């Protein structure tokens, strides 16, 4: 199988493969993705006997790890033509991505797996875990506190409000993606195709935001960020305000969050489900670039035998 970057002449085949495996061409996200985001040079294809057997999309990101900035490929849309499956083509293509990332001095590649068991034998490992929490909206009311004000976004014009929250939320954490104006606009536009964005405010300005969808009487918050505890409680109150509209709210918070220890009346596992949820895989491509000069926390103590 020949592995190469796609060209404009591959566009119809690439779209057809995405449409078969993911969203159909009539889906708004499909149309937006291939108009605004996908670039031929960021798509890797596996060609067999003159036809595209498989492909993957390489979304470029910069991650913050211990204060250093690393360029990475975020792999999405791994797809194999139905007539070419069960032949190991996708794994061969992913290994081709490893070689290309190494050539481009990218120390890691990352992805969000639909089936982790497919990727683990290729050297991937979970590097990001989070809390998955769910509760009936009326139960969240006891933990929330109404914001000074709240609104839902209808465009990416107010991206700076979200950026200020995200910056505060991530500043002491690792593995988060750098976002500039252009990436924020794309991120917001993609969310508004399929769902909603709520922003809460206190007297000082933006305090929290929520990316969410409503489907089958369930609210699912795919991204949540806040500047402080008041911002978190404001988002809880926003979700609680959907009593009568939804039966369940599902949201995610970072693994270093210990707020559940202070929930009232033994809420954890009683009326708020709280479980760890691994969700991102990473694979080290170049250990030297990845670890050379990486600082360690001054709080770490110990000896090397």
Residue ranges, per PLM feature:
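Short amphipathic alpha-helix that is part of the acyltransferase structural core
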Residues: 1-60, 67-74, 141-182, 215-222, ...
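A short, internal acetyl-CoA/4′-phosphopantetheine-binding micro-motif in the GNAT/acyltransferase core
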Residues: 75-85, 114, 218-229
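Conserved acetyl-CoA pyrophosphate-binding loop and the N-cap/start of the following alpha-helix
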Residues: 84-96, 230-234
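Conserved active-site alpha-helix within GNAT-family acetyltransferase domains
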Residues: 103-107, 113-131, 256-272
């Amino acid at each position: 199988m020949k592995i190469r970057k796609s060209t404009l002449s591959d566009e119809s085949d690439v779209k057809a493969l995405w449409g078969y495996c993911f969203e159909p061409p009539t889906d708004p996200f499909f149309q937006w993705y291939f108009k605004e985001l996908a670039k031929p040079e960021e798509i890797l294809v596996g060609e067999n006997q003159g036809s595209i057997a498989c492909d993957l999309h390489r979304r470029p990101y910069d991650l913050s790890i211990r204060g250093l900035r690393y360029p990475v490929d975020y792999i999405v849309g791994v797809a194999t033509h139905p007539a070419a499956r069960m032949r190991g083509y996708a794994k061969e293509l992913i290994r081709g991505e490893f070689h290309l990332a190494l050539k481009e001095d990218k120390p890691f590649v990352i992805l969000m797996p639909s089936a982790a068991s497919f990727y683990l034998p290729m050297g991937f490992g979970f590097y990001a875990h989070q809390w998955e929490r769910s509760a009936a909206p009326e139960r969240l009311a006891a933990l929330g506190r109404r914001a000074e004000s709240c609104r839902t976004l209808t465009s990416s014009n107010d991206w700076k409000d979200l950026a200020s929250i995200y910056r505060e939320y991530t500043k002491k954490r690792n593995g988060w993606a750098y976002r500039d104006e252009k990436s924020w606009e794309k991120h917001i536009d993609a969310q508004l195709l399929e769902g909603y964005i709520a922003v809460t405010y206190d007297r000082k300005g933006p305090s929290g935001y929520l990316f969410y969808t409503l489907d089958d009487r369930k609210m699912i918050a795919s991204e949540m960020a806040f500047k402080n505890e008041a911002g978190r409680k404001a988002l809880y109150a926003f979700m609680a305000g959907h009593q009568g509209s939804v039966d369940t709210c599902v949201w995610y918070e970072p693994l270093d969050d210990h707020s559940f220890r202070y929930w009232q009346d033994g809420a954890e596992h009683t009326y708020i489900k709280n479980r760890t949820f691994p969700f991102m895989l990473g694979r080290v491509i170049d250990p030297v670039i990845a670890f050379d000069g990486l600082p360690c926390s001054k709080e770490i103590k110990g000896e090397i035998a």
